[in-house]
Amino acid sequence: MKQSRRQFLKNMSAMAATFAMPNFLIAQNAFAQSAENVSEWKITGSHWGAIRAKVQNGKVVDVKPFEYDQYPTEMIKGIKDLIYSEARIRYPMVRLDWLKKRHNSNTAQRGDNRFVRVTWDEALDLFYEELERIQQNYGPWALHTGNVGWRSTGQFHSCGNHMIRAVGMHGNSVSTSGDYSTGAGQVILPYVLGSTEVYSQGTSWEIILKESENIIFWASDPVKNLQVGWNCETHEAYKYLEQLKAKVAAKDVNVICVDPVKSKTQNYLGCDFQYINPQTDVAFMLALAHTLYVENLYDKKFIEMYTVGFEKFLPYLLGESEDKVVKDAEWAAKICAIQAEDIRQFARMLAGKRTQLIFGWAIQRQQHGEQPYWMGTVLAAMLGQIGLAGGGISYAHHYSSIGIPSSGAAMPGAFPLNLDEGQKPKYDNKNYNGYSAVIPCARITDSLLQPGETIDHNGQKITYAPYKMAIFTGCNHWHRHSERNKMKQAFQRLETIVSINYSWTATCRFSDIVLPACTPFERNDIDAYGSYSNRGVIAMQKLVDPLYDSRSDFEIFKDLCRRFGKEKEYCRNMDEMEWVKHLYEACRQENQGKFDMPPFAEFWQKGYVLFPEGEPWVRHADFREDPELHALGTPSGFIEIFSNKIASYGYADCKGHPMWFEKAERSHGGPKSDKYPFWLQSAHPDKRLHSQLCESKALRETYAIQDREPLFINPEDAKRLGIVHGDLVRVYNDRGQAIVGAHVSDNFPQGVLRLQEGAWYSPLDEKVGSIDTYGDPNTMSLDIGSSSLAQAVSANTCLVNIEKFVGQAPAVTGFHGPHEVAL
């Protein structure tokens, strides 16, 4: 029975006032409380939730969770630090040598942190003059504007949209495809399941908890990762994890975490743990599939009705093709460190009951990262439960509000990314001189070091251009990409780099022109509440005026467009609040007749509008019901165990069906493990969103060790190396080195280390090879493409060694502004 809006809001209010937070959040969020007298508190949103903020004398003095957020995250403690951080970019700055010599500067000096303060007019003139030089002297192939990154929340102030629209009004450029989170998955899964899946709504948690008998979290840690979302997050999924914890305790469901480490999810749920050697998931899956086949446990009817290509995959599984090796449990046991009989029992368990497989993203962030997702889909198909309530496969239940039924309401649109119909750029040059207009995002360093080289990518040929200029806005490229010293060498090839941000990230430090954007808390905006659940619309009310000399991206790029006569076209003759109102009213119009939304003035004063939760839903249920009427988006319309299309590409590292490929480096007896015996896992952090909030001193004090990023290490490994909890440690390989703090924990097995990604790269100096003083794992990670198919990031293919740091450690360099010098 559907409830009225009045009853819905009444129930939400009651829950907000009385709901006890789950145990794993209580300790973190003792500060959280219902926001009494909310009229005294402004409302805004962030990736880590909606908040109320108290402002006195033009300064944020207190922050509380939004009263309808039942499970707020500790990350909101970092909001004040983000606004008032020592790392704030206060004024437009230009690198000293670039200001002297422009595009003829010594680019090896990038990163020496010497900048000259200039006025906004001077900075934007320099920016515009460089755009002119590039388009007049070279053309669109010389300008790189690939801007993959999380940006800040807010539909209007989406910084990437502003940059692409504004620069696009001047001329064309080279952009990127894919992203750093799901690069391999989002390429392989459309071939196999017909959609990217990694960003698709999944079976509702309610149904999983009701119908699943086995729930397998495979390299998935929702307790840690559900704290954040692309839009303003609701955190509703935590209520289902709390219910799941109770079901595990009552032995009503069998839950297993398959992982090299004991995750926060495994510890919170108190569920079973299946250790597996890092990077060996495909071998384990193949052995499970082999057991299902030889013991006649697989669903033949499902394979016949809903898949294609099983007969072409089977010879490989049985050792009759390719390497002539039978992929049985004995074979996998030597690779995975799981006993052969345990593998067989695991397969029988999966087949014996209703099983929901839930995969995380980490296993596709490695070399041959396409294979785990492809083979995982084959495994799910052999179980025959895809499209059943409580069964099948998911690639995203650790992310955002996936699994929370969508309300069905339309959400606000965004500031337009592209030019309007009929608009033309100042330089409408589409001649790329034979170079590619789009490259895979994770190959930017290679493209800089190897201009003119042609590579394979997803059935096409990509040719790198010799870029002269790059623009980054609202993203930290020196966090997400791999192999810092290689990046230093590559970025020296660029003549000019422009960065727009609110903090002095490493990306800004290695730039030439740096423009200070304001934080999302210094501007007005609007955002969806619940990236997938669509539970409402949040007003992002400006908390304080932009600090120092910062401006919104809208104002920055509007002023840039004024320099070439496109200001009015860029902003459509609307200011900030007119745009916010426009986006809201368009959303209101789209929801008319389905959901009541008040006029804008009423909405803005209240700060939010909420919608009821939608109806529970099962992913792929319609396909299962009628595979012809609801065909998948694959070439055949079915699940493709064998892909004729991929096979036709002729790639040696990604063939027509899923396979086990050895890695360039792998721990626990794999390649290069004799020299570098530790696998370095760069997991998503617990108390920040990638590199966002790393500048928060309040949050860093809760996890940093001697002011360094913590390196999680097994007690026996630490003891053997003479390391105790709290020591400084040097972690290193042939690619780089960093100083970190030892966090000894038995959640990590021998030979496995973790440095959380997003740690701000803080090199001792600008020179290639200099030590990172804080602990960015991508200082050491391997910069190679996943395969010729996706060419995605391979950060989790990374071996290192460690030793106790001896002597006086250098100070951390990354959390303050530049050395301001005079010209």
Swiss-Prot record:
Q: How is it modified after translation?
A: Predicted to be exported by the Tat system. The position of the signal peptide cleavage has not been experimentally proven.
- Segments spanning the bilayer are none
MF annotations from Gene Ontology: electron transfer activity; molybdenum ion binding; molybdopterin cofactor binding; trimethylamine-N-oxide reductase (cytochrome c) activity
Reactions catalysed, semicolon-separated, are: trimethylamine + 2 Fe(III)-[cytochrome c] + H2O = trimethylamine N-oxide + 2 Fe(II)-[cytochrome c] + 3 H(+)
What the record notes about the co-factor is:
Binds 1 molybdenum-bis(molybdopterin guanine dinucleotide) (Mo-bis-MGD) cofactor per subunit.
UniProt KW keywords: Metal-binding, Molybdenum, Oxidoreductase, Periplasm, Signal
Tell me where it mainly resides: periplasm
Q: Where in the cell is it found?
A: Periplasm
Instruction: Name any cofactors this protein relies on.
Output: Mo-bis(molybdopterin guanine dinucleotide)
Q: Does the keyword S-adenosyl-L-methionine apply?
A: no
Q: Which InterPro entries match?
A: Asp_de-COase-like_dom_sf, BisC, CT_DMSOR/BSOR/TMAOR, Molybdopterin_N, MoPterin_dinucl-bd_dom, Mopterin_OxRdtase, Mopterin_OxRdtase_prok_CS, Prok_Mopterin_Oxidored
Keyword Metal-binding attached: yes
Gene3D superfamilies in alphabetical order: 2.40.40.20, 3.40.50.740, Dimethylsulfoxide Reductase, domain 2, Dimethylsulfoxide Reductase, domain 3
- Tell me, what does this protein do in biology? Reduces trimethylamine-N-oxide (TMAO) into trimethylamine; an anaerobic reaction coupled to energy-yielding reactions.
Name of the protein in question: Trimethylamine-N-oxide reductase
Can you name the source organism? Pasteurella multocida (strain Pm70)
Name the gene that codes for it.
torA
